[in-house]
Amino acid sequence: IQKIQEVEKQVQRIGVFVCHCGTNIAATVDVKKVVEMAAKEPGVVHAEDYQYMCSEAGQAKIINAIHEKNLTGIVVCSCSPRMHEATFRKAAQKAGLNPYMVEIANIREHCSWIHKDMEEATLKAVILARAAIAKVIWMLLFSQARAL
């Protein structure tokens, strides 16, 4: 059990990146609140927001954070994974992170575009972010358990 607990501490270094998508997300979701809540989640060591995470500058933020914070997994709260999942996986891989330790929380289509109430949309975005964080933790623990 002690060995498992040591592995858990080593692997749980997650970064959360929340995109404004201009006003597509930020007009309905309180992006700062999502960042604030995500930062409090177990295993999260870095959380930040940016206007366009899919942009070159946004990808550079992800790459730099992976290096500087020694991240083992990332969650990107943004638009549909169909749109930019490959973009974020490539950025993670460029930084030396396993691209399959990237999870997308679709807060544009699932929150911003379908809710008018900011509080409701923000709460749902936080829930989706937490679910994505939990999935990354599970993937990290599973990959480490296989190595034991």
What are these regions (language model features)?
Residues I1-L148:
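Residues forming the flavin
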